[in-house]
């Protein structure tokens, strides 16, 4: 019997499980596509336009049916960063956020192209970080590309405009879908200002959608008290920055051991909180061979790694709360400024 005849006479029970699953999925996709088209026609029949200027209008049913035809995003790094997201990693200086970002980039580059925009280290500093005591260099995946600013090409024009424009050119010319930017300060020196921060993030969102990018942007945090938990208020710059990010996580320093770091998840849009204050990732930074990296040593509550306030600390905090309140600050403003809860501010003011 010829192969063609066998194929023609094959029954569903003869088919492999994968083949049957593919056919079932194709059937479901066709049904969803037909349903979405029917919803679109129904919308037109009711004289609701498909677009008005900047806005695209679809029924909720059409929206989810069309979205269901696209694959769900895959996790790029644990549950902290997913495909298609603009994610932020922030930490205080010298806590290892660049080390962690390169570690993330290295893992992702095992399967796809990654551009790491390094605006922090020189090439020599980068080389020394990934060289062991015997002078052996770490061998990175071939898909990992480090990008730095060519100082010779800097002109007298708008630096921020040039950086954004060249990010777009990098997306066009490399076809890379994963960008890690270290750090946001080099995208805009005015991120402290709300309007400038909003404009910057709008442009990044445009690039993300236009080229189907996944972005991880590193940022700093001002000096913070080790007795306070990490919150969104610790992200340096305008609060508008935080609102634009799809996901956010941060690195904190343990108060009980200066060699320990903990990683806390602060914002999630896909999936659920896995590494919140009740389950932070506890790590040490070690050089294994010639690769400097975070080593996961377990999980803990954030509270276990916060500094206990002394009587002097409590007294200073109380005086600061009263001083700010006398200046006319609201309880919310005081809580945000001191990075504590509104209920705690209220309790102290009632004493």
Predicted regions and their residues:
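Conserved inter-motif catalytic segment of the P-loop NTP-binding fold
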Residues: 72, 76-78, 82, 112-199, ...
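C-terminal regions of RecA-like/P-loop NTPase motor modules
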Residues: 20-42, 54, 172-173, 210, ...
